[in-house]
Structure formats: structure tokens, C-alpha cells
Regions:
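Glycine-rich, charged/polar anion/phosphate-binding loops
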Residues: 30-33, 148-151, 189-190, 250-254
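Generic, well-ordered alpha-helical segments
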Residues: 39, 57, 69-71, 79-81, ...
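Extended oligomerization regions of viral-like shell subunits
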Residues: 41, 46, 155-249
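Structured, hydrophobic secondary-structure cores that serve as assembly/anchoring elements
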Residues: 52, 65-66, 73-96, 145-181
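Alpha-helical scaffold segments that mediate packing/assembly in large oligomeric complexes
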Residues: 90-159, 285-290
Length: 290
């Protein structure tokens, strides 16, 4: 339908600028929230873990050694999570629009691949981490106590924690809780940026994967494990040591490929990765009752 101003038909144009889509926050960052130190060129990686007998009571001096047999266990991390996207763009389509269609679709596929891998990492933490017995609903008044208690539970098992992944609801609660405490530099940053950053000795991330549908990953046995959106919605936070979430990549490809079957290009991405919580005692999952 033509647009008129008074009695004159006026021109209509399509913008050359593409409105960006919305994607989940980036939080899966090697060296910050996970580790990729076990990456190898293979179909899977098996990590040795020494069986430790623990501490001993002292004896009187002048005793013979008591030998223990060396033993270890294996932690499997398999490259069995593959994500691939392919979008067909006809040259006739690309020539008829003012924006770079191939680049735009490739960028979209890159973001969707990232989102998919992050959802899998979250499912891995949920499934292989340790659920806390505490199920109290978080509020601004008790958020700090819940966090300290979770850290305490990890510490009792000889572990440490330096990362907290928060649901959007809990992150908002933390903003209110942290804002109540007068720490000038920290308080000012929270007010101006809306980001907690570091608090209580840990780095906080708002993770909207908690509220964006089911999360699926394939575990080290090759079994697809699904965490439903309903179960994710009950999670307040996951607290863990970044060194115990392994995220290894065998292949991470993106390309624009000319096709021999049609006049155009394919915008393609593929990621092959593996996920593992190598020490469950250092990953605490805080849920609340429905």
C-alpha cells in the first residue's frame, strides 16, 4: 500500500541497517568461569586423578614406613557435543537488499552457537554439581547469608569458590543486597553500572540462560541430559571454582561457502566440544522450592 502525503505518493525505502537480535549474556569464558586446560587433539580426554589416602595421625619417631599402593581414577571428558548451523543465501537475495546478508546470517549463527554451548555448560553444572540442602527463597535480606553459607559448604569439603552464576531474579536480589552496604567505591560502581562484579571474594555473573528454555548437554557416557526450563527457574545461583568446569573444544569453525548446487553462499558454523565438572564438591547449586 502506497504512502501518501497530502495527494502525493512518497518514496519508501528499506533501511540498510539490520536491527540486532537479542542473545543471552556471555559468561562461558575460559580462564574466568571455566578451564580449557585439558584440550587435546583426540576424540576424548581422560584425566588422571590421584587416589589420596588423606591425613594420618602421628607416630613415635623411629618407625618404618608403611607403603601404600599408587592408585588413580580417570575422569572422562569427551568431545561429544556438536552444534552446527547452516543458512542458505541466494545471490539474488543478497543483491536485492542493502545490507550484507551473508555476513548478517553468519554473525547470527555464531551467536546461536555460543548460546547453545553456554546452555550445555549450564546443564552440566546443574547435573554434575552438588545440590545444596538449603532451599529457602532468596530475598535482599538473606541473599548475603545464603551466599556465605554456600561458600561454607564448599570450604568444608576442602574446596574453594570464585564464581557465582546468578539467575536474573537472584542477580536483582544481589544488587539490592549489595547496595544496602556502604562501601563507597563498590557501591558507586553498582549504582552506575548495574554490575556487581566482585563481592564476598567472588565474581558474579548474571546468566539469563536460566530463563531461556531447556538446557541440554551430552555427558561423558554420551547420554543427552536435559534440564527443563521449570527446573532452571528454581535455581538461584551456582557457586563454584572456575577450575572444575572443563570446557574443551575440538573444532570451532565459521565460514561463508560458495555452493555448487545453487547460485549463492552458505553461512555455516560448527562447534565440537566437551563439558565436565571434574570435582563436584567444588560446585554448589542453590535451588528454592516452587
Amino acid at each position: 500500500m502506497a504512502i501518501k502525503i497530502a495527494q502525493t505518493n512518497v518514496d519508501e525505502v528499506y533501511s540498510k541497517i539490520v536491527e540486532p537480535n537479542l542473545y543471552t549474556n556471555t559468561w562461558l569464558i575460559p580462564g574466568v568461569t571455566c578451564t580449557d586446560k585439558y584440550t587435546e587433539k583426540a576424540g576424548g580426554v581422560y584425566v588422571h586423578k590421584i587416589v589420596s589416602g588423606g591425613k594420618k595421625a602421628p607416630t613415635a619417631p623411629g618407625q618404618d614406613f608403611t607403603n601404600e599402593d599408587a592408585a588413580d581414577t580417570l575422569i572422562p571428558i569427551l568431545y561429544n557435543n556438536a552444534y552446527n548451523y547452516s543458512t542458505k543465501i541466494y545471490n539474488a537475495q543478497a543483491a536485492a537488499v542493502g545490507y550484507d546478508a551473508a555476513e548478517a546470517h553468519l554473525r547470527d549463527n555464531v551467536e546461536k552457537t555460543r548460546e547453545s554451548a553456554q546452555a550445555s555448560a549450564l546443564a552440566c553444572l546443574y547435573t554434575e554439581g552438588t545440590a545444596l540442602a538449603e532451599t529457602t527463597k532468596a530475598t535482599a535480606d538473606n541473599a548475603k547469608e545464603l551466599l556465605i553459607n554456600a561458600r561454607k559448604e564448599i570450604s568444608k569439603k576442602k574446596g574453594t569458590a570464585n564464581v557465582v552464576l546468578c539467575s536474573p531474579d537472584f542477580y536483582a536480589t544481589v544488587l539490592m543486597a549489595a547496595g544496602k552496604e556502604f562501601t563507597p567505591e563498590t557501591n558507586e560502581r553498582i549504582v552506575t553500572t548495574g554490575q556487581v562484579g566482585r563481592w564476598l571474594g567472588m565474581t558474579f555473573f548474571e546468566v539469563n540462560d536460566f530463563s531461556n528454555g531447556d538446557a541440554v548437554y551430552r555427558d561423558s557416557s554420551g547420554t543427552a541430559k536435559t534440564v527443563s526450563s521449570a527446573n532452571l527457574a528454581l535455581v538461584d545461583f551456582v557457586m563454584y571454582d572456575a577450575r572444575v568446569l572443563s570446557y574443551i573444544q575440538l573444532l570451532n569453525m565459521m565460514r561463508l561457502k560458495d555452493s555448487e548446487l545453487f547460485n549463492g553462499v552458505l553461512a555455516q558454523t560448527e562447534l565440537v566440544a566437551g563439558f565436565k565438572v571434574t570435582t563436584a564438591e567444588c560446585a554448589a547449586v542453590k535451588k528454592h522450592t516452587a
